[in-house]
C-alpha cells in the first residue's frame, strides 16, 4: 500500500513537476512510466503540484482537500487508519439504507449523522449506503459531480470524520456501502486532464469525453480507479461499494474494467480476511452483470445490481403515473412480473427507449439469486430527479406506500430504503449543488428547461439556492407525530418479519409466486408467508387466504375463506397457522 505522506503523481508528458509547499517549489524526481515523486512530508502539510511552470494543481490522489478541489492538498496522518478490523459481512440480502450526509441531519456532517445510527438499528437496517463523499465543488451537493476521487469532502468532516462514522457504524453492527462515481468527473475542479490522458475522445458519454479505459495510457487510469476502490475498502474499511451508472463505462479492452475490479476485490478479501461487496447501478437489464467471472461470456462478477424495473413497477402501480419511463408499467400483471422475474424489459421492446432491451434472469442457472438484485421504493434518483423532489407519500395515501413497502421489503431481493422513507418524511429531496458563478446559473437554467420540455408546470427549486438544500434536511422532530410514527412502526414490523422468518430471509427466486386478484390487488407468496397488497381506495377488498394475520395496514377482519382489508393497505398472513 502506498505511503500517503509521500507526494507522487503520474504526469507522463511533463518535462518537470514541482511539489509546492508554502509557495516554494521543489523539483520532483522522475521514475519509470511517467511517475514523479518527492520525499515524505509531515502530516498536516499543505502542498500542490506545478507542471512545467504552469498553474498550481491539487494532487489527484489527495486524501484531503480542506479548501475544496481548487485548493491545496493536505497530508493525512497514516495513524488515522491504524485500527483493527472489527466487522465483516456479506451484504447481499442485507437491508440497506441510502443516506446523504449533507441532509440526513440539519448539520450535514458525519458527526451529526452518527447520532441517528441507533434509530437505524432499531428500524432493522443492516447496512448504510452513503451517497458520494469524494470531494466536490462547494459546500453542499449530491456528490455526483465529484472530482477528488481519493479525498473525503471537507464540509462533511473530511477523512477523520469518515473514519469515525465508519467505526461508529461497525460498533453497532451496521455495514457501510459507499457510493462511488468513476464513470465521469464533475465539470468544476476537474484537473485530471492536465496530468495525463485520463479521458479519451474515442468514446462519448453524457458528460463528454469518456474516462480512458482502453486507449493509450489506460493502464494507469485503471490503476487510478482501482486504487481509489482499494483505499475505501481496505484503508477506510468500508464494506462495499455502489458503482454509479456502470453502463456508462466505455471499455472495449479484452478484460472489462468491472471484471478486473471484481477480481481485485476478491484478492483484497483474501488479504484482509473481510467480506467485501460490489453493487453496480446499471440500466441495461443484463444478468451478466452479476454472473461470476468466466461463467458466461461478458460476465462482470458484480455481487449485486440495481433493478430499477421493480421500482418502476411499484411506483407506477401505486401512483398511477404512466409518463416517461413509466409508460410500460402500471398494471398488476407488470408488478407480478417484476417481483418474480426482476426485469420487465428482458429482451422485448421498451417503449421509452424505442428498442428491444435487456435479457431474462434465469434462476435455474445457479449464477445468482434474488439477493443479487437491489430494489427500492424510493432512492435519491427516483425522488430527486422529479421536478420538486417529492416523495411517494406526498401524492398518494399512506396506505399505498405501506402496501408497496410490504411487497419490496418482504421480497427475495436486497431491499434499499431511502432516508426518511420509513416515517414518510415530509421533506422533499430536490436536486441541489453549489457550483461556481459560471457553471451554477447554467445548471439552474438547464434543469428548468428540461422539466419544461417534460410538461411540468410546478416551480422548479433553484439547485444553487441554499434554501433548496435546507428544504431537504430531514426533520427528526416529526418522527413522533401520529402518521409518521405509524409508518415507522409499520416498517419496523416488516423488517422484523424479514429477519425472523426463514421464508422471507431467503433469496430464492424459485420460491416466490404472485397472483393478481383484481386490477388493484396482488398476492405475493413466499413459503408460509403471504403478502396481500391493494391500491384500492376506500373499499373493502377480500383476500382469499386463510391463516393468522401477522401485521396489517388498514382495517381488516375475517370473512369466509380468508380476510378482508380496507384499501389502500396490506396484510401479511402466516398460512401455516391455518
Please state what every model-predicted region is.
Residues 9, 529-535:
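Short, well-ordered beta-strand segments enriched in hydrophobic/aromatic residues
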